[in-house]
């Protein structure tokens, strides 16, 4: 009986903890920011989300600095990003060291970084990579990774160009893909459609120019005939 009572007591503890956490969640459910976090927490179940949130709650200030205004100078962005990642990454390592067994470390490291990524435009793997570069004093790699994530327009253009072969195949078009990419780039950058002096011109331009010249020749002949002065005929 004593053993059964002991088991019952141990079984009641986690239920009591879950009940307390659910009460906290219902009291804070009015916040739209937290609701949106729950909706976008891909790969995080509700219990894992709550665990990550409670452990990282004291570091709200550093979580906010992962998403800075776009008009903030680049130097300040780098400074705040490095400071926040060092504090958050060290906090995660402390959690893994003191609260996780060896087989749990990989899982909880992944979950905690994924939770942190909810406060940033970067993915969890990118944030963890930036943390490693900061801790190992590799500023060049940090800068390359950080700046690459700050240029979404380039990646969007690359995605469009990569999707061209798929579109051509789906529509049954078997034309020159490189030519289509060139025309696409000319359309996206107005004013650069005409070739620069000294650059070879495409066959389409050559054909159009030759047809234009042929159509203009008879007009010039007619114009010359009209403009020629009438000369009186002379008898022999």
UniProtKB/Swiss-Prot annotation:
Biased composition, class Basic and acidic residues, residue ranges: 202-216
GO CC annotation: cytoplasm; nucleus
Keywords from UniProt, A to Z, are: Cytoplasm, Nucleus
Q: List the disulfide bonds.
A: none
TM spans (from-to):
none
Region: Disordered; residue ranges are 184-236
Subcellular localization: Cytoplasm; Nucleus
Q: Where is this region: CHD1 helical C-terminal domain (CHCT)?
A: 44-145
Q: Which Pfam families match?
A: CHD1-like_C (PF13907)
| Role played | May play a role in regulation of apoptosis.
Q: What's the entry's take on its domains?
A: The CHD1 helical C-terminal domain (CHCT) may bind DNA and nucleosomes.
Name of the protein: CHD1 helical C-terminal domain containing protein 1
The species this protein was found in: Homo sapiens (Human)
């Amino acid at each position: 009986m004593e053993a059964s009572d002991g088991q019952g007591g141990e079984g009641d503890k986690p239920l009591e903890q879950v009940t307390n956490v659910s009460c906290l969640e219902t009291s804070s459910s009015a916040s739209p920011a937290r609701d949106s976090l729950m909706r976008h927490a891909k790969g995080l179940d509700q219990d894992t989300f709550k665990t990550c949130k409670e452990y990282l709650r004291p570091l709200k200030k550093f979580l906010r600095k992962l998403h800075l205004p776009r008009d903030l100078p680049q130097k300040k962005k780098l400074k705040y990003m490095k400071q926040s990642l060092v504090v958050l990454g060290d906090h995660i390592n402390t959690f893994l060291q003191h609260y996780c067994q060896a087989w749990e470390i990989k899982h909880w490291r992944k979950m905690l970084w994924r939770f942190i990524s909810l406060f940033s435009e970067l993915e969890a793997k990118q944030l963890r990579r930036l943390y490693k570069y900061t801790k190992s004093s590799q500023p060049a790699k940090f800068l390359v990774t950080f700046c690459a994530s700050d240029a979404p327009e380039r990646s969007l253009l690359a995605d469009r160009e990569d999707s061209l072969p798929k579109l051509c195949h789906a529509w049954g078009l078997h034309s020159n893909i490189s030519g289509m990419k060139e025309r696409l780039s000319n359309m996206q950058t107005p004013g650069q459609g005409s070739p620069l002096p000294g650059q070879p011109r495409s066959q389409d331009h050559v054909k159009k120019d030759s047809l234009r010249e042929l159509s203009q020749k008879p007009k010039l002949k007619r114009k010359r005939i009209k403009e020629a002065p009438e000369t009186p005929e002379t008898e022999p």
